[in-house]
């Protein structure tokens, strides 16, 4: 029989499986999904899809098409997401209904997704969403795809501040709003703001806020030009930021799916001033944070020592760095 998805699937709790680290890539923003780069990939190598109308054969088509471009574990994860998120079939459906005939609209949808993956477009942009802290966030070109390391930072904040009475938090450079919204759903009695310079990012963040039932206030602000208002002084308990931190000299080690699709304004800083955004946030933080207020950053590991020195020089105490799951100095924190 020909079937169509008729149920709401249960979404995976993380993004596209685990994003795989590359030994030559120092930063999580260098990658989203591990891929080998093929600047000229012949579409003629893709199996003919028109006769692959049975679910089991369609799975083979997806995996064979992506073979040699993605590692096997990523191909399996992508296949699962294509079936589950794009087509509405659970892993159990795919197994139990392996001989089921798909309708033409689903076959066409899968063909289009595979073609985009062969052009190295991130699957999160293709599907229109990514997973963060167990929730589904809308993403698209112009908004950085959330990384697992950023989720680590958010969990670190929740763990370290679970016994504090937080009244006000700012997420500077909020992007899709994933940090701010996740914190809002955890710290229920706290006013949380998400700042960004990009109207496009703020639009997506606002939509995520509504979809997830959060209560974040999103504000368009340029942290490099921002002067706190009198009523804001010393009223924030916590500031968090995952600002741009990659220098142009690192571009050679980055994957095309990041360089060609994700917003450079969310990735790169000047070669001669890699702490540009951190310094600006630290200085604004001295005016916004109350006494004992906390500052949290996701950082570039190669500038971890410079970050610590900068925070000390700006008058912060309890400065420290923490490693991510891959053992890199990925997070910095300090107390006003």
Question: What is the predicted function of each stretch?
Answer:
Residues 1-10, 17:
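N-terminal helix-forming leader/targeting segments
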Residues 22-23, 42:
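Short polybasic linear motifs
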Residues 26-30:
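Short, charge-rich patches within N-terminal targeting peptides
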Residues 44, 50-51:
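Short, positively charged and aromatic/hydrophobic N-terminal segments
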Residues 55-127:
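N-terminal auxiliary segments of SAM/dcSAM-dependent transferases
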Residues 111-207, 333:
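SAM-dependent Rossmann-like transferase core, predominantly class I methyltransferases
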Residues 189-191, 195-336:
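S-adenosylmethionine
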């Amino acid at each position: 029989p020909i079937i169509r998805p008729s149920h709401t699937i249960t979404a995976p709790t993380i993004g596209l499986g685990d994003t795989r680290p590359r030994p030559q890539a120092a930063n999580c923003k260098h990658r989203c999904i591990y891929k080998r780069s093929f600047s000229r990939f012949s579409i003629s190598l893709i199996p003919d899809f028109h006769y692959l109308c049975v679910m089991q054969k369609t799975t083979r088509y997806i995996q064979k098409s992506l073979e040699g471009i993605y590692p096997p574990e990523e191909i399996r994860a992508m296949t699962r997401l294509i079936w589950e998120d794009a087509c509405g079939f659970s892993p159990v459906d795919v197994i139990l209904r392996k001989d089921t005939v798909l309708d033409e609209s689903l076959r066409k949808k899968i063909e289009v997704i595979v073609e985009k993956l062969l052009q190295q477009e991130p699957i999160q942009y293709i599907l229109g969403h990514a997973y963060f802290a167990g929730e589904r966030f809308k993403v698209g070109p112009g908004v950085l795809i959330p990384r697992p390391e950023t989720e680590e930072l958010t969990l670190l904040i929740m763990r370290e501040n679970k016994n504090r009475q937080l009244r006000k938090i700012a997420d500077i450079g909020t992007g899709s709003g994933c940090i701010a919204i996740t914190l809002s759903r955890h710290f229920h009695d706290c006013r949380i703001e998400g700042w960004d310079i990009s109207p496009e990012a703020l639009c997506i963040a606002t939509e995520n806020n509504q979809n997830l039932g959060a209560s974040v206030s999103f504000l368009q602000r340029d942290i490099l030009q921002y002067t706190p208002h009198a009523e804001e002084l010393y009223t924030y308990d916590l500031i968090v930021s995952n600002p741009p931190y990659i220098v142009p000299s690192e571009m050679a080690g980055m994957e095309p799916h990041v360089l060609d699709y994700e917003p450079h304004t969310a990735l790169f800083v000047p070669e001669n001033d890699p702490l540009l955004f951190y310094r600006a946030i630290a200085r604004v933080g001295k005016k916004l944070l109350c006494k004992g207020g906390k500052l949290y950053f996701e950082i570039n590991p190669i500038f971890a020592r410079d970050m610590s020195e900068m925070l000390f020089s700006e008058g912060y105490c309890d400065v420290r760095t923490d490693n991510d799951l891959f053992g890199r100095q990925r997070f910095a924190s300090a107390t006003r």
